[in-house]
A protein has these predicted regions:
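FKBP-type peptidyl-prolyl cis-trans isomerases
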Residues: 1-217
């Protein structure tokens, strides 16, 4: 029996590059075993709504073949089914003076935000700075260890996991046939982007019994 679109499962996983470097891990116990534990990380099972792009294509394809309780190690995912190949047009050059105007200290290897994009400074010299906006894992084949822990059946729990994935901040409550998202809380003065609201609303109304979503901001 395979996983179908709209089913929500919880998984634990370890993601590695092909040379063995861990780039993501969901289990606190496993992180300690691997020597990569950090207190800053929120370790917990990862929700995956099948068919909605919660994980990379190659991993979702494998999850579709698995059942609750299944686990598999060293799932080999080629770059084209992970974060794609590296694209030369995502490496751009800027005058260093533009960063100095913003009082940004430019150092090779640092992550930097330019407009709405985040990239890595790969070189500087002659008054110019080159920034690579490719995903850090683009062009790399990846290896995953994954275990399917649970299939979420209850609609309220399902909605809570979708909320955590799509929005993450605020409170969620339930009325008959309706979900209320309260984002008007201390420390979160930014609005939820309209595209995020749209995705959340579509996933809720398509994959749970709830017919309406109300946002309070």
């Amino acid at each position: 029996m395979t996983m179908e679109n709209g089913e929500l499962i919880l998984i634990d996983y370890v993601g590695r590059t092909s040379d063995g470097e861990i780039f993501d891990i969901s289990s606190e116990e496993k992180a300690k075993e691997e020597g990569v534990y950090t207190e800053r990380m929120d370790y917990r099972p990862v929700p995956v709504l099948i068919g909605s792009g919660y994980v990379i294509e190659g991993l979702e394809e494998k999850l579709r073949e698995m059942e609750v309780g299944d686990s598999e190690e060293n799932i080999d995912i080629p770059s084209e089914k992970a974060y794609g190949g590296r694209e030369s047009d995502k490496i751009q050059t800027y005058p260093e003076k533009e960063f100095k105007k913003q009082e940004v200290n430019v150092r090779v290897g640092d992550q930097i935000r330019v407009g709405k994009r985040k990239g890595k400074i790969i070189s500087k010299g002659s008054g110019r700075v080159r920034v690579d906006f490719n995903h850090p894992l683009s062009g790399k084949n990846l290896l995953y260890d994954v275990e399917v822990l649970e299939k979420v059946e209850e609609d309220e729990e399902k909605a809570e996991h979708i909320f955590d994935y799509r929005i993450g901040h605020g409170d969620i409550s339930f009325e008959e046939g309706k979900i209320i998202v309260d984002h008007d809380i201390e420390g979160h003065d930014h609005e939820i982007p309209e595209n995020v609201k749209k995705e959340f609303r579509e996933e809720i109304t398509s994959h749970t019994e709830f017919e309406e979503v109300e946002f309070k901001e």
